[in-house]
A protein has these predicted regions:
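Divalent metal-coordination and catalytic microenvironments
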Residues: 18, 32, 59, 83, ...
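Mid-to-C-terminal alpha-helical segments outside catalytic/metal-binding sites
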Residues: 1-2, 174-175, 179-186, 195-227
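Catalytic pocket-lining loop regions of alpha/beta-barrel enzymes
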Residues: 57, 70-186
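Short beta-strand segments
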Residues: 4-7, 149-152, 186-188, 223
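Mid-domain alpha/beta scaffold segments of enzyme catalytic cores
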Residues: 1-86, 131, 167, 205-207
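Active-site environment of divalent metal-dependent phosphoester hydrolases
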Residues: 10-13, 39-41, 64-66, 97-101, ...
Length: 227
């Protein structure tokens, strides 16, 4: 019964506040994937300072300053290398990034552990998964340092209110299971944002339903060991 928190705001004080907020129960709150501005002059200092608390385990890349030219900034690559050298993780929120970006980063930094958020940015419509998305998922998954979170299902649904039946989400979940397998899929609650689309219990029932026919070892890896 432990939790890795994702994420604070990009303010340093908010990252510190979250760590302080949960320090009373270190056995339950075992990690924070924080938010820092990659490619900025103080990134390395802030990451070093925050990581003095061992629960600060990684950074989520959310915004994309400079748009398409973001990865032309060598400071970005220097900071990503710094994360890798520290053996910390990089979460990638797919709203501003593509699976091609994931593939590029993973090839250039093969020792950096990458976690794609929110079912790899799938557009879920309750029908067979988009072939272009399938191809992009398989390409990214060929890199052994790339992992994927099953999170944000209700938010990725084109139909709102979001359906609560497994069959609506299963085409995309099948693709992710085939591509990443039991060792590189990770559960993410996306709480409290999940509550915009339904209750946490409804979300958990969908995910549990998908894993009902998987082995106990697979379920344990997905729900906690892979994290």
């Amino acid at each position: 019964n432990a939790t890795v928190i994702v994420e604070a705001s990009k303010w340093i004080s908010d990252n510190e506040w979250v760590l302080d907020l949960v320090k009373h129960d270190p056995d339950r709150y075992i990690g924070l994937v924080g938010s820092l501005e990659i490619g900025t002059p103080d990134f390395k200092k802030h990451l070093t300072d925050l990581s003095k608390d061992a629960r600060f385990v990684g950074v989520r890349m959310r915004e994309r300053p400079g748009g398409d030219s973001f990865f032309e900034n060598e400071a970005v690559w220097s900071d990503l290398q710094f994360i890798s050298d520290r053996n910390q993780t990089l979460d990638i929120l797919m709203f501003q990034y593509s699976l091609d970006d994931v593939d590029m980063i993973s090839k250039r930094l093969p020792k950096l552990k990458i976690l794609i958020n929110h079912v790899a940015g799938a557009d879920i419509e309750g029908k067979p998964a988009d072939p272009k998305w399938i191809a992009a998922v398989r390409k990214a998954a060929k890199n052994p340092n790339v992992n994927c979170k099953i999170s944000g299902l209700f938010q990725q649904s084109h139909r709102q209110p979001s359906p609560k039946n497994l069959s609506f989400y299963k085409p995309e979940l099948d693709v992710l299971w085939e591509a990443f397998g039991q060792d590189r899929l990770i559960y993410g609650s996306n709480w409290p944002v999940t509550m915009r689309g339904g209750t946490y219990g409804e979300y958990l029932r969908v995910v549990n339903g998908f894993f009902a026919d998987k082995s106990r070892a697979s379920r344990e890896k997905f729900f906690f060991k892979n994290a």
